[in-house]
Amino acid sequence: MGNEPNYGFFAMLDRMQYIARWGLMRNSKTENIKEHSFDVAVIAQCLALMYNRNNNNEGSLQVDPYKVACLGLYHDCTEILTGDLPTPIKYRNKEITRAYKEVESEAARTLVNLLPEELSDEYLSLLDPQFKGEEGAVTKRLVKAADKIAAYIKCIREESSGNKEFLSAKETLRESITALDVPEADEFMRIYVPAFGYNLDQLNGNG
């Protein structure tokens, strides 16, 4: 390597596959944050497309579905350095939440330092986004909703495999998704989520 700069950013992102989610739960199949991030990105993009369709009057705000998807894809990258802190702990009180946000921001800066300087600001805006204005607020809500829907789908997978460990988490997530009051999330849950409980024949229309 000699004196070459250490541009290990993408190699570090690859290590997301080693960070397991649901660490306090008995899993029939372990899920890592790399897998989860893909699910969140796919769902977030769909929610953004739904949002734009539902708000297509002249002068209405439109969000960038690809930016929303990208923010979903990168939303957990800092956990490479921080680990996956269980949600009940992360949001136990405002002090813990605020402190953890600071840790996440520092982790984001540490990661982008593994990039050439000309790229660092672009990636910092993905790893530690500052959701400003109306568009920022909508984008944040959509990504948060996608994150919870992806977690809910994980619970369905576990339930389908006969694991009852996730039943309580599933109910809690369902309530929290409803409480977000994001119409697009409710629509996604109604139209697309039931199929995650189907077997292959049912998905192919043979069941």
Predicted regions and their residues:
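Alpha-helical, largely C-terminal catalytic domains
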Residues: 1-207
